[in-house]
């Protein structure tokens, strides 16, 4: 047994044409069919969707919610982040009021069929919402770069070079990675974005986390980049 209990599919909009604009023609129909197949096989499913300030209250997002409710599955909400094609761009990030609206949805939409809240964000941690980057979540890129989060393009070095545990300990000396920040630092914290993302928008990624965050150069064999 592979011990898989849930399969998540991306749904950019509950309007087929809008979803397919971001994917490929016919993609929406295939997502719906895939969700239904997973449920038929007795597994749980969910849909993941990216929200921006401009689409959060739009029809496409509302129809994602309607679809999820009709299937009894969870909606994993990913807020827009100023990275990748949106590197350093802040104009369509969610606002505090948008975040409150998402929390309102979590509190009022009830539970999915597996007993979990219908609405989920990676910052939701019971009564202690916080950014989990580096503390409860890390990412490894395709070529082995260790990142505090898949959205935060600051490398702690390659996993082949030195101890992952030591690199994480180095990261945790920085106060940005201590569970005290109640919002996503990459997508919601203006101070973090203005200090560590906007100034580097034209530079190749990933950046050196040790230099950017002034981390201790603790693990053996590392040389400054």
List where the protein language model places each region.
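Radical SAM enzyme [4Fe-4S]-AdoMet core and its adjacent flexible, acidic
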Residues: 5-6, 10-134, 142-147, 151
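Flexible mid-to-C-terminal extensions adjoining Fe-S/redox cofactors in radical SAM and related proteins
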Residues: 150-225
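Short, conserved loop/helix-junction motifs that constitute active-site signature segments
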Residues: 1-3
């Amino acid at each position: 047994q592979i011990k898989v209990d849930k399969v998540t599919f991306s749904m950019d909009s509950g309007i087929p044409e809008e979803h397919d604009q971001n994917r490929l023609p016919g993609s929406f129909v295939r997502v719906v069919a895939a969700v239904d197949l997973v449920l038929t096989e007795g597994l749980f499913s969910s849909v993941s969707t990216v929200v921006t300030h401009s689409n959060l209250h739009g029809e496409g997002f509302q129809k994602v919610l309607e679809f999820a409710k009709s299937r009894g599955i969870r909606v994993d909400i990913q807020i827009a982040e100023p990275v990748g094609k949106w590197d350093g761009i802040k104009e369509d990030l969610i606002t505090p009021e948008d975040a409150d609206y998402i929390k309102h949805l979590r509190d009022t939409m009830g539970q999915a069929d597996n007993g979990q809240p219908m609405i989920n964000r990676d910052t939701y941690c019971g009564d202690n919402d916080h950014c989990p980057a580096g503390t409860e979540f890390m990412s490894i890129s395709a070529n082995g770069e260790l990142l505090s989060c898949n959205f935060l393009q600051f490398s702690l070095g390659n996993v082949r070079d030195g101890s992952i545990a030591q690199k994480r300990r180095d990261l945790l000396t920085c106060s940005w990675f201590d569970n005290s920040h109640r919002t996503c630092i990459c997508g919601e914290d203006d101070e973090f974005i203005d200090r560590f993302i906007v100034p580097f928008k034209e530079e190749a990624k990933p950046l050196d986390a040790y230099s950017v965050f002034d981390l201790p150069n603790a693990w053996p064999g590392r040389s400054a980049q």
